[in-house]
């Protein structure tokens, strides 16, 4: 069976116009070309698609069934050709973006929507991971882009462009004994269990770790749930409280004597210098760079 797009277009036109001659006019073909193409299609399918007893061809039941699927098949064939063309011009087969778990409450989906509108056939994979694991995914090639907080020490293999600033705040459950105090000291923080978002690799020291005793989790959702159950204090994204205002009734921001109890970090789009980025990844990087160059409103 050897069916091509032109045969399907002619079949669709005959079904919609009701005759070979009308289909020919619609497609800019001669009637004999349409008639021959339909005859060859019937041979390839081993089916009779049209009865030719009267002046105009009459679709058979089989033709009507196939016609229902023809439009979608033609759309998929066009999408296939467009995707093949995009791949030939440098579009990656798929793009994996890792989002640091504390940033899941931000507007990272804006960038995904932008990519989808520009590259509708691109396979996009979104994963979440702690900061240290996200960087490792870039360096080992399992992700091509990452949305991460700024790093104190840069790996010489990474490259980045700044996006914006985000804040994290130390919090504790309002039913925890420590919450009854208006101010707390660093010594009190040091002696209270901390719930820290950290790498799954226990050999890596977590960032924003202050307490002597701590429990680890790989995402801020779990950290929040444990903090709510009085299992410790922790540092959570301020954006969480905007998304879920009910948390303001259950959690208290810690006011620490010895340091400002609010951590502001730049958020970066990060990639590996050693990776050969495709057209979609490069497009997003260039988009963010160009946006940064625009004057603030």
UniProtKB/Swiss-Prot annotation:
Residue ranges the UniProt entry marks as DNA-binding: 20-39
Principal cellular location given in the protein's record: cytoplasm
Keyword hit for Transport: no
SUPFAM superfamilies to which the protein is assigned, alphabetical: Periplasmic binding protein-like II, Winged helix' DNA-binding domain
Family: Belongs to the LysR transcriptional regulatory family.
Organism: Acinetobacter baumannii (strain ATCC 17978 / DSM 105126 / CIP 53.77 / LMG 1025 / NCDC KC755 / 5377)
Outcome of gene disruption: Deletion mutant shows a decrease in chlorhexidine resistance.
Gene giving rise to this polypeptide: aceR
Key words of the record: Activator, Cytoplasm, DNA-binding, Repressor, Transcription, Transcription regulation
Function comment: Regulates the expression of the AceI transporter. Binds DNA and chlorhexidine. Binds to regulatory sites within the intergenic region between the aceI and aceR genes, and affects the interaction between RNA polymerase (RNAP) and promoter DNA both in the presence and in the absence of chlorhexidine. In the absence of chlorhexidine, prevents transcription of the aceI gene by disrupting interactions between the promoter DNA and RNAP. In the presence of chlorhexidine, activates expression of aceI.
Subunit structure comment from the entry: Homodimer and homotetramer. Binding of chlorhexidine at the inducer-binding domain causes a quaternary structural change that favors interactions between dimers to form tetramers.
GO molecular function, one term: transcription cis-regulatory region binding
InterPro entries registered for this protein in UniProt: LysR_subst-bd (IPR005119), Tscrpt_reg_HTH_LysR (IPR000847), WH-like_DNA-bd_sf (IPR036388), WH_DNA-bd_sf (IPR036390)
GO CC field: cytoplasm
Domain topic, free-text comment: Binds DNA via its N-terminal domain and the inducer molecule via the C-terminal domain.
Stretches assigned to the HTH lysR-type domain: 1-60
Highest rank taxon of the organism: Bacteria
Subcellular location: Cytoplasm
Gene3D superfamilies per UniProt: 3.40.190.290, Winged helix-like DNA-binding domain superfamily/Winged helix DNA-binding domain
Pfam family, one: LysR_substrate
Name under which the protein is recorded: HTH-type transcriptional regulator AceR
């Amino acid at each position: 069976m050897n069916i091509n797009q032109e045969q399907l277009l002619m079949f669709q036109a005959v079904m919609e116009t009701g005759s070979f001659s009308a289909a020919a006019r619609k497609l800019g073909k001669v009637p004999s070309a349409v008639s021959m193409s339909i005859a060859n299609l019937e041979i390839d399918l081993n089916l009779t698609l049209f009865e030719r007893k009267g002046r105009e061809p009459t679709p058979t039941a089989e033709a009507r069934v196939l016609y229902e699927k023809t439009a979608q098949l033609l759309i998929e064939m066009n999408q296939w050709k467009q995707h093949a063309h995009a791949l030939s011009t440098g579009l990656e087969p798929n793009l994996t973006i890792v989002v640091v778990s504390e940033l899941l409450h931000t507007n990272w989906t804006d960038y995904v929507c932008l990519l989808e509108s520009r590259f509708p056939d691109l396979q996009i994979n979104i994963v979440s991971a702690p900061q240290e694991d996200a960087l490792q995914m870039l360096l080992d090639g399992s992700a091509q882009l990452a949305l991460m907080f700024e790093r104190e020490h840069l790996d010489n293999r990474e490259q980045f462009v700044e996006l914006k600033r985000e804040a994290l705040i130390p919090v504790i459950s309002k039913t925890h004994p420590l919450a009854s105090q208006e101010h707390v000291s660093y010594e009190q923080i040091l002696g209270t269990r901390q719930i820290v978002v950290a790498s799954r690799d226990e050999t890596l020291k977590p960032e924003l770790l202050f307490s002597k005793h701590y429990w680890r989790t790989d995402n801020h959702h779990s950290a929040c749930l444990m903090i709510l159950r009085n299992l410790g204090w922790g540092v959570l994204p301020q954006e969480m409280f905007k998304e879920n205002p009910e948390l303001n009734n259950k959690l208290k921001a810690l006011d620490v004597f010895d340091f400002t109890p609010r951590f502001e970090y730049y958020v970066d789009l990060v990639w590996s210098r050693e990776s050969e980025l495709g057209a979609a990844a490069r497009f997003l990087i260039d988009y963010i760079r160009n946006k940064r160059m625009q004057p603030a409103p």
